């Protein structure tokens, strides 16, 4: 009786087992039995994107180079979306996560390096992984104290460059990247960058794109270095989604 007296059920008011619903539910049960070996199994993602909460807090707390918004979350989302659009399963991980099972790791704006994290990233690339780093990486330790000796800390050899300074753009300002002719990624178009543009000094990295204007026109905006058995890419600016 009451409001649910005509609510759908496996067995209706007729009470028999020769109804369509009963038969279809039975078929579902039989199919689930056949899937017992699959139940509990996992699909290992080949790619991961670093999103670390403590890193986010540290970026939010820093005074400069932009006081309004550093767009850390958006930087993570851009790389996550790019990997998903390639049909890859992607894990979102913190700095405590082991990297050895991945083929690709993107660590955008890894401003804070917990103790030994730079070694973990180096080892990942040395062992054959593809590592994507960006501007504003490896500046402070786990207590938010500046790391000395150059940035990205502990990774300058791996990326083949050292960061020198960073240009904070107003919200209405833009720059753009121009691809090098014959670059191995086959990049042909120009791409807009906003908010943060890092200036780097290349040692032995391959320059794939350069800034198109301002006082740093012609300086690298995208680099690559073969490191160990793997590859390290460094994105020097906050590039638009289409770039990825």
Predicted regions and their residues:
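Carbohydrate-binding surfaces of carbohydrate-active enzymes
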Residues: 1-244
